Amino acid sequence: PMFNRMDDLLYGNPKKLREISESEDEIHVDRKMNVWGSGGAHSTYFKVVTDFIISIFNQPIHLQPKGILDMGCGNGAFIQHIFETIERHTLRGKMLENHPLFLVGADYNQAALNVTRANLINNDIWAKVIWGDIGNPAQLAKDLHENYGINLADLVNIRTFLDHNRIWKDPENMI
């Protein structure tokens, strides 16, 4: 979609591509297509993380986290990969009935959340899929605690996305 707006980018007002209301879809990218492509591109990363996930969830149950938060969950492929890895290859996977895994997919983009939710439902994976901003972890922690009674610190926090579509914000409360 962005290349269809090349005249605005080169000769007009490039800010037009970002001027949308909160309820409108982005006009510079087809986010559903972007989410689909990102999910496939991350498969190599998934393989590397698998060993890490297995080692964490093979520990004695009292040492294991309550679950995992995937920040920038995209299409939900990473949550699906993590769940299947834990279920099939770890001590925790044998204990899911008594020690359920709290899975959270968080994303800044509503289209990504919709795709994640649909993919996880289609794969019969229970997870909370919520809006979250990596630039505001305090709000994410507050939302998790208030809405689900879970502390952010009790989850393994993982992300697979590139920092994109983010406007620079100056740090606040610098010491």
What function would you assign to each model-found segment?
Residues 1-67:
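Conserved Class I S-adenosyl-L-methionine-dependent methyltransferase catalytic core
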Residues 109-110:
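Conserved SAM/SAH-binding beta-strand->alpha-helix loop
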Residues 104-106:
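The conserved SAM/SAH-binding core of class I Rossmann-like methyltransferase domains
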Residues 65, 100, 154:
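Phosphate-coordination loops involved in phosphoryl transfer and adenosine-cofactor binding
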